[in-house]
């Protein structure tokens, strides 16, 4: 039973991580360029439908990845090693945890309020409000930067998890 629990928790953790980091890749390299290629009048309707759903999805996947990661440590039987930070396993896992929590924190601090603000600016910008259009462009630029940060951190996090798995 113990092996089954470890296998299930590890599977869920890896699947959630792939979906979370993969969503970042998809957003930055496929979805955003496609959205920017759409005619400006169409962007608002697409964004209003897509953005809240996507933010919800990204944040829940990040939270589930972290939850299953902690469960994975508990069911691994190696949780005592985390207090020592003397092994390659514990150091790489600690690095991965810190980076993952930081990435989720960025999502909650930047992405969620930014999307809310962007959706409130959209109708004003569409009516010709230059200040709203400028602020919206700034938010989109921050989102693009955040997307690249998510991709980069995601690759580092995956690397730390591979090191931990092989340790």
Predicted segment positions?
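Polytopic transmembrane helical bundles with strong interfacial aromatic enrichment
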Residues: 1-167
């Amino acid at each position: 039973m113990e092996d089954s629990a470890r296998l299930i928790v590890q599977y869920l953790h890896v699947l959630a991580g792939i979906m979370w980091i993969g969503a970042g890749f998809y957003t930055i390299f496929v979805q955003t360029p496609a959205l920017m290629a759409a005619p400006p009048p169409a962007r608002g309707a697409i964004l209003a439908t897509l953005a809240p759903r996507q933010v919800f999805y990204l944040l829940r996947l990040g939270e589930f990845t972290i939850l299953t990661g902690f469960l994975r440590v508990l069911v691994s039987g190696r949780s005592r090693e985390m207090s020592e930070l003397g092994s390659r396993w514990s150091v790489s896992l600690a690095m991965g945890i810190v980076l993952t929590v930081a990435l989720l924190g960025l999502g909650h601090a930047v992405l969620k309020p930014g999307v809310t603000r962007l959706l409130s600016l959209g109708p004003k910008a569409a009516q010709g409000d230059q200040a709203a259009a400028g602020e919206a462009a700034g938010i989109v630029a921050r989102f693009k930067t955040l997307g690249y940060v998510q991709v980069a951190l995601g690759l580092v996090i995956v690397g730390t998890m591979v090191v931990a798995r092989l340790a």
